[in-house]
């Protein structure tokens, strides 16, 4: 192969895809818009839930996707000093209550010992661990509102 062909082939190589954690409930708009969590509203009874095969209220299997609020309040949290393999410690896990009456489990961004219950937080994205190719897995997290 000529040097020029090798150079062109290298420049055409695709950048590695970003791995998102739970793409079934996390939407990252390709147009650069703000990321959001996805809820699913039952078309029969209106029950709102995260991704599910069947409505937890009426057992219907028909849903419509609904963008959820990007802000919520910390319901409870735990500072983790000895954690699971692959996660740098310390870190914070929390349950965050969204205005849509849904509670989501997520990592909080920032230093331990800095959050309190009922504190308002906002959705953000960040790495949570590395995949098998040693590339970051990006997930939804929540952070303090500036």
From Swiss-Prot:
Keyword Transferase: yes
Keywords attached to this entry: Acyltransferase, Aromatic hydrocarbons catabolism, Metal-binding, Transferase, Zinc
Matching InterPro entries: ChsH2_C, ChsH2_Znr, NA-bd_OB-fold, Thioester_dehydratase-like
One of the Pfam families matching this protein, by short name: OB_ChsH2_C
Binding site for Zn(2+): 42, 45, 55, 58
EC number: 2.3.1.310
GO molecular function terms attached to this record: acyltransferase activity; metal ion binding
Involved pathway(s): Xenobiotic degradation; toluene degradation
Enzymatic reactions: (S)-2-benzoylsuccinyl-CoA + CoA = benzoyl-CoA + succinyl-CoA
Subunit structure: Heterotetramer composed of two BbsA subunits and two BbsB subunits. Both BbsA and BbsB are essential for enzymatic activity.
Family: Belongs to the BbsA family.
Function: Component of the BbsAB thiolase complex, which catalyzes the thiolytic cleavage of (S)-2-benzoylsuccinyl-CoA to succinyl-CoA and benzoyl-CoA, the final step of anaerobic toluene metabolism. The BbsA subunit critically contributes to an induced-fit process for productive binding of a CoA substrate into the active site of BbsB.
Domain comment quoted from the record: Contains an N-terminal rubredoxin-like zinc finger domain (residues 16-70) and an oligonucleotide/oligosaccharide binding (OB) C-terminal domain (residues 71-160). Binding of CoA to the BbsB subunit induces conformational changes of BbsA and BbsB, which may directly affect the turnover process of BbsAB.
Name of the protein in question: Benzoylsuccinyl-CoA thiolase subunit BbsA
